[in-house]
């Protein structure tokens, strides 16, 4: 965004958080120019998608836990731990399935639900359990270890848009995102 601000000083971005189930319609109506999210098989034919990066789910937990000795975390490794789930109300099917693959056998008392990734990380930092999040630009937490989940799928994360034909700023925004892809994970 900093580079975009320099190239387009009159551009006035509006950043919104919408459930992935809603942004396709907003893009169709041109109520917004672009949306970032996980690739969905239900993408409308009139919309385009450019992949920015591919990501697995990460397991984050207190660095003092025995899990920190492992490089890759399996579902078996999580048997004795509560799981902190990211649940913003309306959740991406990708995030939902990625988390529930590891949480489905837990008792309700072993599950914590958080509306933001920051809250999930805060609970993990306080020792309530482990959190499972897409490994995308996660805020650093000094006392948390981060490990890859075994057997987890790799998910495509990118930008959805209707057209950038008459919107050079949008084309440049997508190009800048792709150039900065290394910083997403």
Residue ranges and their predicted role:
Residues 1-9, 76-77, 93-108:
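Ligand-binding cleft/hinge of the Venus flytrap
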Residues 1-42, 113-114:
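Central regulatory/effector-binding core of bacterial HTH transcription factors
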Residues 19, 74, 115-116, 134:
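Short loop/turn segments at beta->alpha junctions
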Residues 24, 38-45, 95-96, 117-145:
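A ligand-binding cleft/hinge motif common to bilobed small-molecule-binding domains
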Residues 38, 81-104, 171, 184:
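Secondary-structure junction motif
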Residues 46-57, 61-83, 168-171:
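Flexible hinge/capping segments at coil-to-helix
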Residues 48-58, 131-135, 142-157:
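Short beta-strand->loop
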Residues 146-185:
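A late-sequence structural motif
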């Amino acid at each position: 965004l900093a580079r975009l601000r320099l190239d387009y000083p009159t551009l006035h971005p509006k950043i919104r958080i919408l459930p992935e189930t809603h942004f396709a319609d907003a893009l169709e109506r041109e109520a917004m120019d672009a949306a970032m999210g996980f690739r969905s098989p239900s993408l409308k034919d009139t919309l385009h998608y450019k992949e920015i990066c591919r990501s697995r789910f990460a397991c984050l937990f207190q660095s003092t836990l025995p899990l920190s000795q492992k490089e890759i975390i399996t579902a078996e490794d999580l048997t004795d731990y509560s799981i902190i789930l990211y649940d913003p109300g309306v959740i991406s099917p990708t995030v939902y399935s990625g988390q529930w693959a590891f949480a489905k056998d837990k008792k309700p008392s072993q599950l914590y639900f958080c509306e933001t990734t920051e809250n999930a990380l805060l609970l993990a930092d306080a020792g309530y359990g482990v959190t499972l999040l897409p490994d995308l630009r996660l805020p650093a937490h000094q006392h948390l270890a981060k490990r890859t989940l075994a057997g987890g799928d790799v998910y495509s994360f990118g930008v959805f848009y209707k057209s950038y034909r008459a919107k050079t700023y949008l084309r440049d925004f997508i190009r800048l995102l792709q150039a900065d892809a290394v910083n997403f994970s």
